[in-house]
């Protein structure tokens, strides 16, 4: 499971770090669709995120969207560098452009997600 990326219907990738810890970010396909990301509003450290609810807000050259979370958990790490420089989202959405790390309330279930972007 570790090292694999799973993809949600919300255009968010999920990278399991441990059974209950995952890293989340925007799929490259969605980044290409949105165009140049100009600004991001990320959740605060310690925030409780619910599946299907707002994970972050992205403003691009084309539109502004709410990105929905594919899983529920507590934010234990935030890529705050993105708030000052969105370059990693635009050029490395599936690596350096990650959004947050969540502590899940239960073990990650990859069966619900796709391995294809």
Curated annotation (Swiss-Prot):
The keyword ATP-binding does not apply. Pfam families: GCV_H (PF01597). Its cofactor is (R)-lipoate. The modification N6-lipoyllysine is found at residue 62. The keyword Ligase does not apply. InterPro entries: 2-oxoA_DH_lipoyl-BS (IPR003016), Biotin_lipoyl (IPR000089), GCV_H (IPR002930), GCV_H/Fam206 (IPR033753), GcvH_Chlamydia (IPR017514), Single_hybrid_motif (IPR011053). PROSITE patterns: BIOTINYL_LIPOYL, LIPOYL. Belongs to the GcvH family. This is Glycine cleavage system H-like protein. The gene is gcvH.
